[in-house]
Amino acid sequence: MTNLEQFYLTEQHQLFRKTLRDFLDKEVVPFVDQWEIDQQVPKEIFLKFGEMGFFGLTQEEKYGGSNLDFWYDVIFIEEVSKSNSGGFGASISAHPYLSLSHLKHEASEALKEKYLPKAISGEWHGALA
């Protein structure tokens, strides 16, 4: 058991880690090499991540998020990093942690209401320019 697990993570965190790991092993790992060749992550995988709630872990519930603590984000990044693809990890992590985090902290209420629900669901993809 690591210090992180011993001192900070609850049973709910561990259950989330297992759920995410099982999801990645089924929906990502078998296909990630082809995605690297194609230089593209299929839109369907973003929708699946959205359906599982992975894009809204620390987002407010009123936008479709789960309003969970920071440790869920840490677990998400750790597990995605184990998927043997830097391209996939960067692509799937940029959406919630680069684009959506800016909306969460900087956008007006009107912009949050317009963009966050569809972005959290995986229907829309965020980007930085």
Language-model segments: residues:
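Glycine-rich flavin
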Residues: 29-129
